[in-house]
């Protein structure tokens, strides 16, 4: 990568705006450091009052207590801050910041700030802090007289212009007038700092011995430099650079004497350090130099333009965008921009050719056109050659500068670098500090956008997703200076943050999005990370259109954003949910645990309830001797509902036989074998043994000989499962008690779960009460909450006992058979004869209707059957019955269609009314 190092302080600036006018007027060759502190605030007084504060009653100027201020100034000098100023680092002071406010521009007078006079022997540089304000009345008369000379000199050369009338104006005419006035005052009031770097063709001795000659002329009378001599590089680039003011080696004296044209070159034309005390430098926002020896890119190399990578083109684009933003916002940074632009045009060689002229006046083209700069930048050539350094012209070797290398700014491509794009305000101020954020904030989105990058709705980042389709042209530009609303999108004044307004949604567009197919995501191509910043290095460099096919109907559809902020309602892209299945209400109450030996010691049991839709843990159940439980549940269930109750840490008693008594050879006295005792021990035992003691030891030996059973408490776990399909008919509309086995945890899958079945691996039985209520068209808050409450409400439902019997003819397959039929409530029982064999049972579910006989064949009518009945069962079976008289058929229809359930009078519960209607 080619790098060229350059200095912005090598260019000569005489193009000053209104701010530069005041700076040049207040700069004097023989001035001391600026006072660190002043009393009062200049922003609170008018220009006339500020002028009065600088003078005594007799008209003498007052500059404050210099002895006290010199102490503070010397403290700053001890910090060795001269090198910072010599390298061009400015400092924003209070007077500079206050000039940019609208109410202070007109009130600020050019005579409101004066610098302390400094002797020529001290040679101090201006201090780092400068604050405008009122002065006290204890200053010396010398400072006031020299300050008055400045005003007198200005009024002498500009009799028609009043210095107090000069104010900051944005108009072009006032700016040009300020430039013309500043050209003389700048040359008249050069500070000692500006003599540290001289013109390449002016002798240093002549400059130091004849300081009056430096103020004899003005900048517009400068002579051009011959093309055969190269300009001298800045002093800070030389190998012999030191800290402090630097003076370039003077040229041979005969160079100036042989060429009389060069005698007209003034001292003010020297390459000064481009520093003014009241105009701090604003560094150009460029990316730092990085090692990019291994190029990387997320776009094809064929799409990269060399002109976009070159230093000269990139610099001009940056300057053009800075100029456009500062002019549009009304700021007064035009002079600083022109200085840098003129230097970039003068200091660097282009196309291998040396400049034959060094223009030191940038006021000739003080208002460059932005379009001209951009067009010229596209015509630059030979800037991307793989040359890391270029040698300095030979003319510099005679001056003792050695080999100096010009470094260039980074050459990596902005669109392919792994950077985080920042948000910039209208003034171009940078709000982040990543590698290329400075340039990305200055350049617009068109300079950095690639077809693979698109602003995603609903995010706070302009580039936060990797789009699968080509971005819409209407959404590429989000920059706007004013807040506006377009189709539900509110753009903030920062120009890059867009928030979606759901109130502006159009129903037609929502329906279209709902019916469209969602954009398919390729898991290998698109990262699903939760972060907003996508790493450009991980993305493939080939074209996306050749990687996969876009689904049909999604060409003009926006991609689904990967975001967790919730600004975008993703339900628009989802399919409509299907209608839910009819759900009933299932109530369960746990009663107790049976057939299990639970320890009498109070020990807690953990119970976990697991359903297809949820998983809950009950509080610890304190188990007593009766093993009772007390828990209620209510579930929304379908026919395939299943619930499991897992019991953990059940304490049970494990009774096992202990070790039998000791053998007969054991000594009765102490329980040890006799042969293990020593002779001395036997002697003393026999000596001190008593009869009473022998009896006690013998009784203890008998007790120890008996086998004792030890009780061990262990904890086991098991699971009890209940299926609704097994108990639905029994608990439909009424409470039903059931026992289900608790199967050991290790044998849960080996043993089938059946009601009242106890296997070898079961721990016990769980007793519970259940109740099922079908789905009713009532709100959920109207339904009972517990099984006990539902049972109390069902007591108000009265069941009507329906009964009828007789002979009817039934169509079975292809024949008609005479059967004896018995009706009990809503159930039909068929027998071969009265008191004969039972054949079938039929449960009525709907209203029974009559069938006209014209629908049947002649064979049926020939049997003497005059009426027919059609009935439907619960399982949707149909049965056809016939009678030999219309009177018998009418009686059966009346009984079958009678209500079997009725509600007691005075009952107003809505769910009971719906339940009775459902059962009827």
UniProtKB/Swiss-Prot annotation:
<feature type="region of interest" description="Disordered">
    <location>
        <begin position="1"/>
        <end position="452"/>
    </location>
</feature>
<dbReference type="GO" id="GO:0005826">
    <property type="term" value="C:actomyosin contractile ring"/>
</dbReference>
<keyword id="KW-0539">Nucleus</keyword>
<dbReference type="GO" id="GO:0110085">
    <property type="term" value="C:mitotic actomyosin contractile ring"/>
</dbReference>
<feature type="region of interest" description="Disordered">
    <location>
        <begin position="538"/>
        <end position="561"/>
    </location>
</feature>
<keyword id="KW-0597">Phosphoprotein</keyword>
<keyword id="KW-0132">Cell division</keyword>
<keyword id="KW-0498">Mitosis</keyword>
<feature type="modified residue" description="Phosphoserine">
    <location>
        <position position="24"/>
    </location>
</feature>
<comment type="subunit">
    <text>Homodimer. Interacts with blt1 and cdr2. Interacts with gef2. Interacts with plo1 and rng2. Interacts with fhk2 and sep1. Interacts with clp1.</text>
</comment>
<dbReference type="GO" id="GO:0043495">
    <property type="term" value="F:protein-membrane adaptor activity"/>
</dbReference>
<dbReference type="GO" id="GO:0000281">
    <property type="term" value="P:mitotic cytokinesis"/>
</dbReference>
<dbReference type="InterPro" id="IPR011993">
    <property type="entry name" value="PH-like_dom_sf"/>
</dbReference>
<keyword id="KW-0206">Cytoskeleton</keyword>
<feature type="compositionally biased region" description="Polar residues">
    <location>
        <begin position="542"/>
        <end position="561"/>
    </location>
</feature>
<feature type="short sequence motif" description="Nuclear localization sequence (NLS)">
    <location>
        <begin position="681"/>
        <end position="710"/>
    </location>
</feature>
<feature type="domain" description="PH">
    <location>
        <begin position="802"/>
        <end position="901"/>
    </location>
</feature>
<protein>
    <recommendedName>
        <fullName>Anillin-related medial ring protein mid1</fullName>
    </recommendedName>
</protein>
<dbReference type="InterPro" id="IPR001849">
    <property type="entry name" value="PH_domain"/>
</dbReference>
<feature type="short sequence motif" description="Nuclear export sequence (NES) 2">
    <location>
        <begin position="763"/>
        <end position="773"/>
    </location>
</feature>
<comment type="function">
    <text>Scaffold protein that anchors the contractile ring (CR) at the cell equator during cytokinesis. At the onset of mitosis, membrane-bound oligomers of mid1 assemble recruitment platforms for cytokinetic ring components at the medial cortex and stabilize the ring position during its compaction. Recruits dephosphorylated myo2, but also rng2, clp1 and cdc15 to nodes and to place cytokinetic nodes around the cell equator the medial cortex to promote the ring assembly in cooperation with F-actin. Necessary to stabilize the mitotic spindle perpendicular to the axis of cell division.</text>
</comment>
<dbReference type="GO" id="GO:0120104">
    <property type="term" value="C:mitotic actomyosin contractile ring, proximal layer"/>
</dbReference>
<feature type="compositionally biased region" description="Polar residues">
    <location>
        <begin position="461"/>
        <end position="481"/>
    </location>
</feature>
<dbReference type="GO" id="GO:0005546">
    <property type="term" value="F:phosphatidylinositol-4,5-bisphosphate binding"/>
</dbReference>
<dbReference type="GO" id="GO:0090488">
    <property type="term" value="F:polo box domain specific binding"/>
</dbReference>
<feature type="modified residue" description="Phosphoserine">
    <location>
        <position position="95"/>
    </location>
</feature>
<dbReference type="GO" id="GO:0071341">
    <property type="term" value="C:medial cortical node"/>
</dbReference>
<dbReference type="GO" id="GO:1903475">
    <property type="term" value="P:mitotic actomyosin contractile ring assembly"/>
</dbReference>
<feature type="short sequence motif" description="Nuclear export sequence (NES) 1">
    <location>
        <begin position="69"/>
        <end position="81"/>
    </location>
</feature>
<feature type="modified residue" description="Phosphothreonine">
    <location>
        <position position="34"/>
    </location>
</feature>
<feature type="modified residue" description="Phosphoserine">
    <location>
        <position position="15"/>
    </location>
</feature>
<dbReference type="GO" id="GO:0005635">
    <property type="term" value="C:nuclear envelope"/>
</dbReference>
<feature type="modified residue" description="Phosphoserine">
    <location>
        <position position="46"/>
    </location>
</feature>
<dbReference type="GO" id="GO:0005634">
    <property type="term" value="C:nucleus"/>
</dbReference>
<dbReference type="GO" id="GO:0140693">
    <property type="term" value="F:molecular condensate scaffold activity"/>
</dbReference>
<dbReference type="GO" id="GO:0031097">
    <property type="term" value="C:medial cortex"/>
</dbReference>
<feature type="region of interest" description="Cryptic lipid-binding C2 domain">
    <location>
        <begin position="551"/>
        <end position="920"/>
    </location>
</feature>
<keyword id="KW-0963">Cytoplasm</keyword>
<dbReference type="GO" id="GO:0008289">
    <property type="term" value="F:lipid binding"/>
</dbReference>
<feature type="modified residue" description="Phosphoserine">
    <location>
        <position position="531"/>
    </location>
</feature>
<dbReference type="GO" id="GO:1902408">
    <property type="term" value="P:mitotic cytokinesis, division site positioning"/>
</dbReference>
<dbReference type="GO" id="GO:0106006">
    <property type="term" value="F:cytoskeletal protein-membrane anchor activity"/>
</dbReference>
């Amino acid at each position: 990568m080619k790098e060229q190092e350059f200095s912005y302080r090598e260019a000569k600036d005489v193009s000053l705006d209104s701010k530069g006018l005041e700076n040049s007027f207040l700069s004097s060759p023989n001035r001391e450091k600026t006072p660190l502190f002043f009393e009062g605030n200049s922003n609170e007084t008018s220009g006339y009052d500020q002028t009065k504060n600088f003078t005594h009653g007799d008209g003498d100027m007052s500059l404050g207590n210099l002895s006290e201020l010199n102490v503070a100034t010397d403290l700053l000098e001890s910090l060795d801050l001269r090198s910072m100023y010599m390298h061009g680092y400015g400092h924003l002071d209070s007077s500079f910041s206050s000039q940019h406010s609208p109410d202070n521009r007109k009130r600020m007078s050019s005579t409101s700030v004066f610098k302390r006079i400094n002797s020529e022997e001290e040679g101090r540089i201006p201090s780092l802090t400068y604050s405008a304000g009122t002065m006290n009345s204890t200053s010396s008369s010398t400072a006031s007289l020299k300050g008055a000379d400045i005003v007198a000199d200005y009024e002498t050369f500009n009799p028609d212009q009043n210095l107090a009338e000069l104010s900051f104006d944005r108009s072009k005419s006032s700016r040009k007038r300020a430039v013309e006035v500043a050209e003389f005052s700048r040359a008249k009031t050069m500070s000692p700092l500006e003599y540290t770097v001289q013109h390449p063709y002016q002798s240093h001795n002549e400059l130091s011995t004849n300081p009056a000659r430096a103020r004899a002329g003005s900048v517009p009378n400068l002579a051009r430099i011959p093309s055969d001599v190269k300009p001298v590089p800045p002093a800070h680039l030389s190998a012999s650079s030191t800290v402090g003011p630097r003076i370039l080696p003077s040229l041979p004296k005969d160079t100036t004497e042989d060429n009389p044209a060069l005698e007209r070159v003034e001292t003010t034309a020297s390459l000064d350090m481009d520093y003014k005390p009241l105009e701090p430098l604003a560094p150009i926002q460029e990316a730092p130099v990085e090692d990019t020896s291994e190029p990387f890119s997320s776009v094809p190399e064929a799409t990269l333009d060399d002109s976009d990578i070159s230093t000269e083109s990139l610099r001009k684009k940056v300057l053009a965008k800075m100029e456009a933003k500062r002019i549009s916002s009304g700021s007064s940074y035009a002079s600083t921009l022109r200085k840098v632009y003129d230097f970039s045009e003068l200091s660097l060689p282009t196309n291998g050719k040396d400049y034959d002229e060094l223009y030191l006046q940038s006021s000739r083209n003080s208002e460059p056109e932005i379009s001209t700069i951009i067009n010229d930048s596209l015509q630059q050539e030979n800037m991307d050659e793989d040359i890391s350094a270029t040698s300095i012209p030979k003319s510099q070797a005679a001056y003792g500068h050695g080999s100096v290398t010009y470094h260039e700014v980074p050459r990596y491509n902005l669109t392919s670098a792994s950077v985080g794009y920042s948000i910039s305000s209208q003034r171009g101020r940078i709000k982040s500090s990543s590698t290329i954020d400075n340039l990305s904030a200055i350049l617009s989105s068109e300079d950095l956008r690639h077809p693979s990058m698109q602003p995603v709705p609903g995010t706070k980042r302009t580039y936060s997703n990797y789009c699968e389709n080509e971005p819409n042209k209407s959404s590429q530009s989000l920059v706007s200076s004013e807040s506006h609303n377009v189709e539900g999108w509110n753009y903030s004044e920062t120009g890059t943050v867009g928030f979606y307004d759901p109130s502006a949604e159009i129903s037609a567009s929502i329906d279209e999005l709902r019916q469209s197919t969602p954009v398919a995501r390729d898991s290998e191509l698109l990262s699903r990370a939760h972060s907003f910043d996508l790493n450009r290095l991980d993305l493939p460099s080939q074209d996306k259109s050749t990687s996969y096919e876009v689904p049909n109907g999604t060409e003009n559809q926006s991609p689904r954003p990967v975001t967790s902020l919730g600004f975008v309602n993703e339900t628009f892209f989802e399919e409509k949910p299907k209608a839910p299945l009819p759900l009933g209400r299932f109530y369960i109450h746990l009663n107790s645990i049976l057939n299990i030996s639970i320890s009498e010691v109070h020990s807690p049991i953990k119970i976990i309830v697991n359903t297809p839709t949820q998983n809950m843990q009950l509080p610890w159940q304190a188990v007593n001797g009766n093993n009772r439980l007390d828990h209620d549940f209510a579930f929304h269930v379908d026919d395939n509902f299943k619930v499991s109750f897992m019991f953990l840490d059940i304490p049970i008693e494990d009774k096992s036989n202990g070790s039998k008594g000791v053998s007969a050879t054991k000594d009765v006295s102490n329980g040890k074998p006799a042969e293990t005792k020593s002779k001395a021990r036997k002697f003393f035992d026999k000596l001190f043994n008593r009869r009473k003691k022998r009896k006690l030891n013998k009784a203890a030996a008998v007790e120890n000989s008996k086998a004792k059973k030890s009780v061990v408490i262990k904890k086991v776990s098991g699971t009890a499962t209940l299926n609704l399909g097994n108990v639905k008919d029994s608990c439909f509309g009424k409470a039903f008690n059931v026992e289900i086995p608790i199967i050991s945890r290790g044998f849960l899958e080996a043993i089938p779960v059946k009601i009242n079945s106890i296997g070898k691996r079961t721990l016990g039985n769980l007793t519970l009460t259940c109740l099922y209520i079908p789905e009713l068209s009532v709100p959920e808050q109207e339904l009972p909450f517990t099984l006990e409450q539902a049972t109390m409400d069902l007591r108000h439902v009265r069941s009507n006992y329906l009964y009828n019997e007789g002979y009817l003819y039934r169509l079975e397959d292809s024949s008609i058979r005479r059967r004896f039929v018995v009706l009990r409530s809503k159930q039909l029982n068929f027998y071969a004869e009265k008191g004969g064999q039972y054949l079938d049972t039929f449960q009525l579910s709907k209203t029974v209707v009559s069938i006209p006989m014209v629908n049947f064949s002649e064979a049926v009518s020939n049997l003497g059957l005059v009426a027919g009945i059609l009935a439907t069962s619960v399982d949707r079976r149909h049965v056809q019955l016939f009678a030999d008289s219309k009177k018998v058929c009418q009686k059966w229809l009346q009984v079958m269609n009678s209500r079997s359930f009725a509600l007691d009078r005075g009952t107003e519960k809505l769910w009971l009314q719906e339940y009775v209607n459902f059962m009827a």
